[in-house]
Amino acid sequence: MVEAFKIIGGKKIAGELKVDGSKNSTLPIMIATLVEKGTYVLRNVPDLRDIRTLVALLESLGLEVEKLDANSYKIINNGLSGAEASYDLVKKMRASFLVMGGMLAIEKRGKVALPGGCAIGARPVDLHLKGFEALGAKINIEHGYVEATTENGLIGGNIVLDFPSVGATENIIMAAVKAKGKTVLENAAKEPEIEDLCNFLIKMGAKISGVGTSRLEIDGVDKLTACEYTIIPDRIVAGTYIIASILFDGSIKVSGIVPEHLSSFLLKLEEMGTKFKIEGDKLEVLTKLSDLKPAKVTTMPHPGFPTDLQSPMMTLMCLVNGTSEIKETIFENRFMHVPELNRMGAKIEIDSSTAKITGVENFSSAEVMASDLRAGASLILAALKANGESLVNRIYHVDRGYENFEEKFKALGANIERIKTEA
């Protein structure tokens, strides 16, 4: 038996949605507690399946993890019990591969299973491994495991990433903070989540300059100090909630946002005719859905339009009069939600990496299946708009990235229920 959402859509929903802490910040920051012994307290941690998966992985490596409340954790690092991350845990989530950088920093070696996770494209770890090699690690891959070893610890080096990979940037930063000498990382990813990781490590005493730019300079230090830290809000959850608000003519206020983390997304929505009122961390939509006009979107590394908001944006474009386009440049296979939206009455055609979306009046209710986390969110939004009963299967994907999704939308008046199904 698996879980699904039964949604009776077409209802009026209104109220306020508060954005949770960032999953994509929490994962690397939790992993960064491997880098130095001590007691850490992390706040604004989202209550998600991926976080629970990571807790099990950290505990398997010898860390003590205590949940203080729904969104706070205490992590005690008294030294690792081993430097091997097994396939059983790593296969559940790609971010698990980030433990390699932390293990190299503290243990000078690491052995990690090649990762599993989402069904979106290849997502190779080659860039991570090139980075480790540039810092003096020897890499050996066999039997589905990557083993990295060093003679006497890592040594600073110059690294140019072929692509600004978020995961590779994070893994290399963690490995380099205690390496001997200076590391220069060019073409680094610039996502807010990278900044958050850097700020956490800087609070611990790491010497990192160029934070928020594509060129990071890291002067290795011998010792860091464990600290308390508050995670930034999740910009992808924020974007999803803002799209929900537009779909319902601005009846949902969104709080807990960082507007500068959403610049390209908000600019694109403004180009489509959306007007906002932003006060501090609160955003209100002042436009009706029917007033929007079509647009073209190309997903890009930050600060461009985020690939993680591509599928929720597509749901919105399905109900905008005229023809819109989305070009996906980050991941292959990231249009798996398209056949499902088409089942709900959308008119979307795919040509290679571009989706052409012709607006329709509304979605029709249907049974659909989430293929990944963001696709799941896009289908739920469509089902909330559609008149009648829809079933969204495989919602375990959604639980990986959205905290208490159904409870939050129920509080707005949505008719959404978690049920068990055979599918």
From Swiss-Prot:
It is an enzyme of class 2 (transferase). PANTHER family: UDP-N-ACETYLGLUCOSAMINE 1-CARBOXYVINYLTRANSFERASE. Signal peptide: none annotated. It comes from Fusobacterium nucleatum subsp. nucleatum (strain ATCC 25586 / DSM 15643 / BCRC 10681 / CIP 101130 / JCM 8532 / KCTC 2640 / LMG 13131 / VPI 4355). It is found in: Cytoplasm. The gene is murA. The modification 2-(S-cysteinyl)pyruvic acid O-phosphothioketal is found at C118. Pathway: Cell wall biogenesis; peptidoglycan biosynthesis. This is UDP-N-acetylglucosamine 1-carboxyvinyltransferase. NCBIfam families: murA, PRK09369.1. The active site is at C118 (proton donor). UDP-N-acetyl-alpha-D-glucosamine binds at R94, R123, P124, V125, D126, L127, D308, I330. It catalyses: phosphoenolpyruvate + UDP-N-acetyl-alpha-D-glucosamine = UDP-N-acetyl-3-O-(1-carboxyvinyl)-alpha-D-glucosamine + phosphate. GO terms for cellular component: cytoplasm. Coiled coil: none annotated. Phosphoenolpyruvate binds at K23, N24.
